[in-house]
A protein has these predicted regions:
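Immediate post-signal-peptide N-terminus of mature secreted/exported proteins
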Residues: 14-50, 54
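Residue-level marker of positions within ordered structural domains that often coincide
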Residues: 7, 29-30, 64
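Sec-dependent N-terminal signal peptides
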Residues: 1-12
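Compositionally biased, proline/threonine/alanine/serine-rich low-complexity intrinsically disordered stretches
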Residues: 12-16, 164-165
């Protein structure tokens, strides 16, 4: 019985395979390349992704298929975008823990749905406003809030083994 429990605990303690891959990709990209990737993504430019592609290839060691490569690239980008938007929000006094708390309270379908409706986004903004954040501050930082929320959704999809497209 103890052996079974020990094996079960060890299995639970092991990082999920996707987490190992994402960690590898994230750590393989330099801070300047991360900044460039984020800037290009936020500006809608589909360029400058060489560092990301290279990191995915190195970390995948030619063992990831195209879908897995896309998942690792998308997860890494989501981490970069989440961290960038978290920094921006924190700098203006909007703690991301409030967004995290709101997100965790949403049903599982919402947490993995890449199409956030205006009504759902309004619920988040109203919640933050109700916690004392000025509507002007929230409006001025709507892009960072939306980017942060979008990154949480993509990362939840990856965590659950769902495609990110």
């Amino acid at each position: 019985m103890i052996a079974v429990v020990s094996v079960a605990l060890l299995a639970l303690a092991q990082p999920k395979p996707h987490a190992i891959g994402v960690d590898c990709v994230v750590s393989a990209i330099s801070a300047p390349d991360r900044a460039s990737l984020v800037a290009n993504a936020l500006d809608g430019r589909a360029q400058g992704f060489d560092a990301l592609i290279s990191a995915v290839r190195i970390c995948g060691r030619d063992q990831w298929n195209a879908e897995q490569q896309g998942t690792m690239a998308g997860a890494a980008m989501s981490i970069f975008l989440r961290d960038d938007s978290a920094g921006k929000l924190t700098a203006v006094g909007v703690p991301t823990r409030e967004i995290d708390r709101w997100f965790s309270e949403q049903h599982a379908e919402f947490q993995t749905n890449t199409e956030v409706t205006d009504a759902e986004a309004t619920r988040l903004i109203d919640r933050l406003h109700g916690q004392g954040f000025a509507m002007e501050l929230l409006d001025a930082n709507g892009t960072a809030i939306g980017t942060y929320l979008g990154a949480l959704i993509i990362l939840r999809r990856v965590e659950q083994g769902l495609p990110i497209d």
